[in-house]
From Swiss-Prot:
Primary location: mitochondrion
Active site residues according to the UniProt entry: 299
Organism: Aquarana catesbeiana
Any GO BP annotation: L-arginine biosynthetic process
Its job: OTC is necessary for the tadpoles transition from an ammonotelic, aquatic larva to a ureotelic, terrestrial adult.
InterPro entries in alphabetical order: Asp/Orn_carbamoyltranf_P-bd, Asp/Orn_carbamoylTrfase, Asp/Orn_carbamoylTrfase_sf, Asp_carbamoyltransf_Asp/Orn-bd, Orn/put_carbamltrans
Protein name: Ornithine carbamoyltransferase, mitochondrial
Residues the record lists as binding carbamoyl phosphate: 86-90, 137, 164, 326
Residues of the transit peptide: 1-30
Transmembrane segments: none
Keyword Transit peptide: yes
Length: 350
């Protein structure tokens, strides 16, 4: 990975009807990410994550607002390997990659059985000779790690049982668009200690964001990742609250977030989980404890037991803006990992 310095002048970033004013400064450092894998945000620095979001915001502005045609991925091909079903990840990746002039190829478990008909090692080497990148949606994080070790092209995590990094990038872009910054905000996660939460835990503190986590007993996030999150919080001077009380977690939060209580592969546990998560539904009672300017996010698909209609469909719910931003952030990731692109939009405030 190459690193270099880029001098820019921070001024105001106008997007739509918003004008985000920033302080003037010079010698902003960012990482050139071409050729990198994106398996987790744990090993991405704050500046690297911010750069991915910057590119996403730039592409959204230039393509959606200005109507530019940017064939940045012309001649590039992407292998999409999906062991798990998907709506938003598949659609955002296929449409986004094609919009930039690239060619995505979708492979299901009927087309490719990772590590079954062919070893992961061999699959990685075959894909490296035929495509420019791989986005894989798998059960086991270890499969992604083997692919990344053996492949000579970027491997992107489209979701695993451990992490969902591209979802969290969309969340951060949505929050930034709404508030104009991320630093100092408090995210409240109320629900299961799952892969989406793990990705928040590995990145929120790097933006200077505080994190409140409420899970039922027995559904806490991974213990080793909890320790890593505590260390990130300590290094970044942020607050990390972990509790079994959803109302305590909601107190003072700027962003209320939840997700499915029954992830893919856990269908047999549904009846037990619905009982164990009783009291964790996000309602206006929950929201009344949050900051006055709270917003609500959910990666979708949503079930009514997770959040009621009053919150889900209210003006403070940004779930559909969040869903759209899945496209722009995956486009930002692909452009960053496959090209030498430099954003034209002035760097947003984070």
């Amino acid at each position: 990975m190459l690193h270099h310095m880029r001098t820019i002048i921070n001024a105001s970033w106008r997007y739509g009807n918003k004008c985000i004013v920033r302080q003037f400064g010079f010698s902003q450092t960012y990482s050139q990410l071409k050729g990198r894998d994106l398996l987790t945000l744990k090993n991405y620095s704050a500046e690297e994550i911010k750069y991915l979001l910057w590119v996403a915001a730039d592409l959204k502005y230039r393509i959606k607002e200005k109507g530019e045609y940017l064939p940045l991925l012309q001649g590039k091909s992407l292998a999409m390997i999906f062991e798990k079903r998907s709506t938003r990840t598949r659609l955002s990746t296929e449409t986004g990659f094609a919009l930039l002039g690239g060619h995505p190829s979708f492979l299901t478990t009927q087309d490719i059985h990772l590590g079954v008909n062919e070893s992961l090692k061999d699959t990685a080497r075959v894909l490296s000779g035929m495509t420019d990148a791989v986005l894989a949606r798998v059960y086991h994080q270890s499969d992604l790690e083997v692919l990344a070790e053996e492949a000579s092209i970027p491997i992107v995590n489209g979701l695993s049982d451990d992490y969902h990094p591209i979802q969290i990038l969309a969340d951060y872009l949505t929050i930034q668009e709404h508030y104009g910054h991320l630093k100092g905000l408090t995210i409240s996660w109320i629900g299961d200690g799952n892969n989406v939460l793990h990705s928040i835990m590995m990145s929120a503190a790097k933006f200077g964001m505080h994190l409140h986590i409420a899970t039922p007993k027995g559904y806490e996030p991974n213990s080793s990742l909890t320790e890593a999150a505590k260390q990130f919080s300590k290094e970044c001077g942020t607050k990390l609250l972990m509790t079994n009380d959803p109302l305590e977690a909601a107190n003072g939060a700027n962003v209320l977030v939840t997700d499915t209580w029954v992830s893919m592969g856990q269908e047999e546990e549904k009846k037990k989980r619905l009982l164990d998560f009783k009291g964790y539904q996000i309602t206006m009672k929950t929201a009344k404890l949050a900051a006055p300017n709270w917003i609500f996010l959910h990666c979708l698909p949503r079930k009514p037991e997770e959040v009621d209609d009053e919150v889900f469909y209210c003006p403070k719910s940004l779930v559909f803006q969040e869903a759209e931003n899945r496209k722009w952030t995956i486009m930002g990731v692909m452009v960053s990992l496959l090209t030498d692109y430099s954003p034209q939009l002035l760097r947003p405030t984070f």
